[in-house]
Amino acid sequence: EMSASLVGSEMCIRDSKEDFHIHHGKMVEGTMRYFAEKLGYGDEVDFWGTVGLLHDIDFEMWPEEHCKKAPELLREAGIDERMIHAVVCHGYGLCSDVEPEHEMEKVLFACDELTGLIGAAALMRPSKSCKDMELKSLKKKFKDKRFAAGCDREVIIKGAQMLGWELDELLNETLEAMKTCEDA
């Protein structure tokens, strides 16, 4: 039997033709793996990672049905219902009315947009990397609404609130997470 993470990798690559989507999936996967370890879910690292990898599985081919097409695609691949629920609720309030319940789902909701913002900020740096980025630099980019305008700050703020974290904590931890997976 193939592992969910292997199926996840194959689906992600098959259904994401654009490098950007593959890269985003891998960044969110690495970030989710980091948070699983950090928050005491060490036995679920692969599960959290696979959810991160698959969270936008329907976005590229069916952007109008984002979070609505995913359950069908994932069920066909034999992905379990917990994972499907997590994928669907990452779009809560945007393209889904399924609310994040589990801590893992709240982390995905909170860091999905934020990984995009950090990635965009990294590309502006001479190093093209987030490894030498400091929290104050990220906070400046976060406050500048024109920078990476497609990254919804309200979702990031709402995600921090869902988790019961200060915004700075979410920004800092997600930045640290991305430093661990940037080369993936």
Positions of predicted regions on the chain:
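Alpha-helical phosphate/pyrophosphate-handling elements in metalloenzyme active cores
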Residues: 18-46, 60
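Divalent metal-dependent catalytic cores for phosphoryl transfer on phosphate-bearing substrates
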Residues: 41-147, 157
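Electropositive phosphate-/nucleotide-binding environments in soluble metabolic enzymes
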Residues: 18-29, 64, 101, 132, ...
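An amphipathic alpha-helix signature
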Residues: 9-10, 29, 33, 71, ...
